[in-house]
Amino acid sequence: MADSPIPSARPARFSRRDAGLGVDPGADLPAGLAAHLAAHLSAVDRPIAAARGLPNAAYTAAEFHRFERAHLFARAWTALAFCADHATPGRVTPVDFMGWPLLIACARDGRPTVFHNVCSHRGRRLVDAPKTTGGLLVCPYHAWAYDLSDASGGLKSTPHIGGVGAHQADGFCRAAHGLKAVRSHCWLGVLFIDLSGDAPAFEEYAAPLVARYRPYLGAAMDGGAAAAEALASPAADAGLTLEAECNWKLAVENYCEAYHLPWIHPSLNDYSPLQDHYAVIVSEDFAGQGTRTFRPALGTGTGDGDGDGDGAGAGDGDGVGGDGDGVGDGGSDGDGAGDGALPEFPDWPAAQRETAEYPVFYPNLLLGFQVNHFFALIIRPLAAGRIREEVRLFYTGDGAHAARCQAARAANLAAWTRVFSEDISAVEGMQRGRQSPGFGGGVFSPAMDAPTHHFHRWVARKYRAALGGGGGCGGDGDGDSNGE
C-alpha cells in the first residue's frame, strides 16, 4: 500500500421497477433549509485551505435524516449487516434501516436476500422478530404466504381472496405481487444494499478498493467461495456494538484523520506517532488514512498497544494499524507461526508488514486492513444525532477458531473496544458544538484533513444532485482525489 498513492447475496429477481423506493413525500428539505444548504455547498468545494465544512443543520436537523436516507443512503451501496449473521437456511430477520422496514431472509443455499418487510396485500409488516420458517413466510394479518425457499419471494398463497374457500380471484395475478426485493451483495463479510436499484454494479463500484487491497488480502477481496475460505469471523470474541450521541457524518470524519491521535489516543501515539500516518485517497467514493508503524510483533495478548484506529464510530483511521493493535496479535512472531500467534494473510508483502490502512466505504462502512486481521464497522444512523456502531473482526487461516489463538483474539477485541470507546467523547463533543451559532461548518488543515475534506465533497455532491444541481450516484462528481 503506497502512500496515498463470503458468499455473495442473491441478485436474482431484483427489478428496478419494484425497488420500492417510490416517492418519499418527506424526503425533500423544506424550502428554507434547502436554500440554506445550497448556499453552503460551493464553499465545501473550494481548495482545502479555503474550504468550509457542511453547515450545522446537516448534523442537527431531523429533516436531514430523512433527506439523506432517500437521496444519499438509498442511492449508493450501503452496508446493512454482516453476512454470517444471516447464513442459517430458513431464518428471517427484520432490520430497521433509518426507519424503513426491511427483512433479511436466508434461502436453502445459505445465501442472504433482502426484501422490503411489508405484505403486498394491506401493507402489514411481515416479520416483527427474528424467526425460522419452513421456507414459507406467512403474513400474520390475512395469511398471505411468500416463498423464501429459493429466495424468490413469490406470492404462493392468498387464502379466500375470491371469497370463502376461493383462494384465487379472476384478474388477480399472484406473480405480480410477491415481496419487493432489494438489490444486495455480500463482500468482505458485509451485506450491502442498493435501495434505489440505480447504483453501478457492485463489482464496478468497489473495483478501486479491490485493486488497491487485493495484493495484500488476496482472495479475501474477491467475494464468493474464495473469500469465504480466506476469511472467518469467530462466533465469540469477534464483535462489539457501541452507541454514540452524534451524527453519522462525524463518525466518518473522525475515522478519516489521525490528527487527533496525540490527544485522544496518547498511548498509541507513543509508539505510532502522528508523523507515521498518511492520507489515503482511493477514488471518489473511498478515502481514509494509513500508518507505516503497525508492528505485529508488539502484541503479547496483554494489550500493550492501543490499536487506536478509529473509534466508536469515530475512528481515527490510523487505527489499530497504528500498531497498537499489536494486542490483537497475541504475540505474533511475524509469520503467524508462533504459539498463540494470529496467522497472517499469505499474500501480504513481507516488506510492508508494518503498513496498515483504514479506508471508508462511503457512506457508512469503516474498514481496517492489517497483516493479521481486518475489521469492518457498520455505522447505523438512528436519528440526526444518534448512531449505533457494529464492529466485526475477521481473521485468516485458522485464526478465527483455533484454540491456540483464543487469547490473541480476546486481547485484540479488548484493544479495539478500548480504542473505539476513546473516540466517543470526541464525536459527541463535536455534535454538541454543532448547536452553536458561532460555528459555521469549520475549516480544514491542508496537511491533516485531506480525507475529511474528500468526504465533505462527496456528501456535497450527493446533496447537490438531490437539490437538482447535478452530480449523480456512485462514481459521480468531479473527482476530488487531487489537490487536497
Residue ranges: model-predicted function:
Residues 32-35, 57-61, 142-143, 301-302, ...:
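Short low-complexity stretches enriched in small and charged residues
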Residues 3-21, 106, 111, 117, ...:
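C-terminal catalytic domain of Rieske-type non-heme iron oxygenases
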Residues 2-129, 183-185:
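N-terminal pre-ligand scaffold of iron-sulfur
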Residues 74-85, 160-168, 358-363:
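Short Pro/Gly-enriched beta-strand edge/turn motifs at strand-loop
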